[in-house]
């Protein structure tokens, strides 16, 4: 619902949500459909909330607009002016998901090479010569090359010598902190404050053990620094207490840091996933993916299907 109707982020997130639930059922991956509330804590946010609701409906998302009276009955401890309820939202055990996908690759005779550096790729006639190093340098010859390397996608795109550098999008690193909360709380669902142009804001979420955590914030950094800056705690407190005034700051403890590979600049609005094939860049057999950040996990299986279709054309 956050993304323009027809964008890759919108279409692949909606399809990916359904595919993930189906895949989790088949593979016995832990997940829960717990629903999500997108909240307005002030009356002057209701117009923006209504626009988000209408955009979600136009994209085919199942949503319910919740009145102030109803949302206050549901969450009497929160300061809320209105909300949107998304019943299909949920949580999934990402390590279990990755393990299942790893098993599928190996079952289909694929090879996963860990701790391996991508050195370069050159196109010769119909094949890519891909040079790698896992302690020893080796080559792979393939008709297809898919670059889906996240935080390193800009660096690795530069190493694909057949590709014009104008198709290489600069990656901007958006660092996000998460705090866990150890006290009592009023939440049984995901709670997302209204997003701004740059991120979805500091939301309340859970893991499958029921641990409540808040995050992420957004801090633009120049390198892959995963250290936790505890000075951001005051910003978290201010943000959370706008809708949960009784939150106890002493129960808010550092949890972890993540970094998102954004292709938007710090002062730019959200940008769509970049998934480029030969019709755009002219290199047959190459699919180049950049800016696969949120909602990347939800979209992941749909992205895989989308890339497979591009290769079949």
Describe the residue ranges of each PLM region:
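C-terminal lid/capping helical subdomain adjacent to the catalytic/cofactor pocket in oxidative enzymes
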Residues: 270-313
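Short loop/edge segments at beta-strand edges and connector loops
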Residues: 33, 67-68, 114-116, 254-256
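Active-site substrate-recognition segment that forms the wall
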Residues: 29-31, 139, 148-281
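A short, glycine/Asx- and small/polar-enriched loop/turn
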Residues: 44-48, 74-81, 122-129, 264-270, ...
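Short beta-strand to alpha-helix junction loop
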Residues: 4-15, 39-48, 84-103, 227-232, ...
């Amino acid at each position: 619902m956050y993304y323009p109707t027809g964008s890759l982020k919108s279409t692949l997130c909606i399809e990916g949500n359904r595919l993930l639930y189906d895949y989790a059922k088949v593979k016995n991956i832990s997940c829960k459909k717990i629903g999500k509330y997108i909240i307005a804590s002030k009356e002057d946010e209701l117009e923006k909330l209504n626009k988000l609701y209408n955009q979600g409906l136009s994209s085919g998302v199942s949503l319910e607009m919740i009145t102030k009276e109803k949302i206050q009955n549901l969450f009497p401890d929160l300061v809320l002016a209105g909300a949107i309820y998304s019943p299909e939202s949920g949580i999934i055990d990402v390590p279990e998901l990755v393990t299942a996908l790893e098993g599928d690759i190996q079952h289909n005779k694929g090879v996963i090479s860990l701790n391996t550096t991508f050195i370069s790729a050159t196109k010769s006639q119909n094949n890519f010569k891909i040079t790698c190093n896992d302690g020893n340098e080796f080559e792979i010859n393939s008709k297809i090359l898919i670059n889906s390397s996240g935080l390193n996608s800009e660096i690795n795109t530069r190493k694909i010598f057949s590709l014009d550098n104008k198709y290489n999008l600069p990656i901007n690193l958006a660092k996000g902190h998460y705090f866990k909360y150890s006290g009592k709380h009023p939440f049984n669902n995901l709670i997302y404050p209204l997003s701004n142009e740059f991120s979805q804001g500091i939301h309340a979420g859970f893991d499958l053990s029921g641990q409540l955590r808040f995050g992420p914030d957004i801090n633009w950094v120049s390198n892959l620094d995963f250290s936790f800056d505890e000075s951001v705690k005051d910003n978290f407190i201010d943000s959370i207490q706008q809708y949960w005034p009784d939150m106890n700051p002493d129960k808010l403890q550092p949890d972890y840091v993540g970094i998102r590979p954004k292709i938007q600049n710090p002062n730019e609005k959200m940008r769509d996933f970049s998934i480029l094939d030969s019709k755009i860049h002219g290199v047959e057999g190459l699919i180049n993916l950049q800016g696969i950040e949120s909602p990347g996990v939800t979209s992941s299986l749909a992205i895989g299907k989308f890339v497979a279709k591009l290769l079949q054309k």
